[in-house]
Amino acid sequence: MKILKNIFAILFLSNIVFARPIIIKLATVAPEGTEYYNLLFEMGQRWQQETAGQVQLRIYPNGVVGGERDTIRKMRVGQIQASAMSSIGLAELTDQIQAFTLPMGFQNYNEIDKVKSVMFDDISKGLSQSGFKLLFLVDIGWVYWFSAEEISVPKDLMDAKIYTTAGDYITVELFKKFGFNAVPVSETDILTSLQTGMINSMQTVPILSLSSGWSALMPNMLDL
């Protein structure tokens, strides 16, 4: 059974004006060398080829410009022109993206594709109202619980230090309401926080856990 679905989107500032040649700075928390980074790299190569070098994509991976909230702020002031962003960042710009993060809301990719096709225009409109242009939405996999200690029932998480995104006060309060210990951490500080024991459990997609080195510190994955 699937818990959550994570969505990856490419955003552009809708009102940005470029001088030629165009250099587009794109920020993402996706680690360099992963499938998703490689897709972005290939996209940039294609743009450069199709425009005879007039459009160039400069990718900043691994969250080097900050977390997704930081990226949104830097896009608004023109430091960054584009972002490959997860549903966490997108939720800062439009509530409609939360449809893809409903617990137990989807059973397979066909259901996801159907909802994406129905909601794409509405999501795009919501982002446009915030000053951003949506290029496309892609899947990055099902979200699972990862933990340093073995978990099988909710009670096993009562003593865990659960990661939540810094600034996501609603999720923190929700965890606390049910007796869990939520620890807000920036996306760029997750690995350090795992190494120091500040957090020891989180919800994420397997490819990100593996490529970021988190799975070495949280070897237990709960498959619902």
Where are these regions (language model features)?
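Sec-dependent signal peptide recognition
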Residues: K2-I10
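Short secondary-structure capping/junction motifs at helix and strand boundaries
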Residues: L4, S124-K125
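Enrichment for repetitive, rod-forming helical segments
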Residues: A9-L13, E32
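N-terminal signal peptide c-region/cleavage motif recognized by signal peptidases
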Residues: S14-A19
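N-terminal secretory/targeting leader peptides
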Residues: R20-N110, L127-L224
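A gly/proline- and charged-residue-enriched helix-loop-helix capping module
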Residues: Q107-S124
